[in-house]
């Protein structure tokens, strides 16, 4: 079926069910940013393939809301679908909730699958629409009823992460979380975030593309640990090891019946912004719900000593692979046909030559020319174009290794570039360098540093429509909270104090629709600096080890300090990566990291 046909089929079903508006978020049952094929309902009903967005379907209109990363892509993919694009955050554009409040009339019915909407959002919708006496239909998966060839739920084999990689045993992590439960006087801890469960139990999976997580729910008490998952995904030995730590595995969907039977008056700790509304609605009404951030969130974000050491090794391996790729690309772009897709395949080949490489940490973005202006462009067979010996190609890629997860962007010059391109290439690079060089007093959050990255662009009256940085997991999700770099304060997602061990991306960019796009990204590790009479000072350690392309830089735009920052970084890259290169690559890297 075409998107138009799917919309028509959904509207027929909505009429049968008495539903006036149907809400389709991107989420799975766990609030994941990226979802498995089974959960791609929003993609199915709209045709939009981006990782973020919400659809609303009514009898006479349909809308899609997405953020600035995807404005160009969404506009292109929605052509001819009758679906209207709402650019979230733009002046005059209503939010999904504002739209529903305006469009839904007295006593109408709003529908959604309660497993894909968080308890917090469901409560907000009920409060917002209560004055109109709006009813809610949340028990039916209407998309599932019309999606005849829907993929099955993923059931990939589970692996255990040895303590030499994790740095802390499962038993120690469990004990620490139970201590937190006791301090909060909680009887039950409900954990549904997939990366948090994987971190806590030192397990990894492959149930979401590029995200090494296991579809599961976890219920913890002071005596029990119940893991609800696909039992067949666990080898017998892993089951035995989990049971040795008190973890028993039950069928995935039985979690809903279990929470219904939680003892009367229990104090249940969970995060309403992450746990789905159907699960929370199944909890006995007389239970006391303690709505707090997951107890695992901060310990997961603060990498331990072993994880920090391993991440350094992962970034050396990744630096070797990406450096080899850039050398290969610049050497061969005029000699053979290289397309966006074939370049991505070649980079994967270089990464796969590294020991302990497990796969991409997200779908690679190899965007040439005008495609680079699409922030999260993803080449397909239909959009794939050849690279030429002119202009720039943006390569935003990453890998999973047993030693950790990487995420790097380099804008690579393939031939002549204009002064305009150099101007913005240099401004973005200055922002990257200035943020990474920050030294600060303990207690700062990511909000304190965003200006360092955006400043050179703001001086030009320019900006970019995405955050400057996100947290990165350890062999987990490449996007991990709560740390990040942004300038807007988000009340629902307060910026945490930056702690030693937090790993964050530093990725300013500039995008000119129809012309070019530039992004420079390194990962920086928060570290302690000296302690003085004024308190503890902190700094960032750059882990990414790949040269920035000197051919795109206008040194005259840079201060002496900024040039020194770049030269010092390039010296470290050369010293670190050279031992792993052949003679041709060494000679090339010597030139690529020369002083300016």
Residue ranges and their predicted role:
Residues 1-596:
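Active-site neighborhoods and metal-handling regions in enzymes and metal-associated proteins
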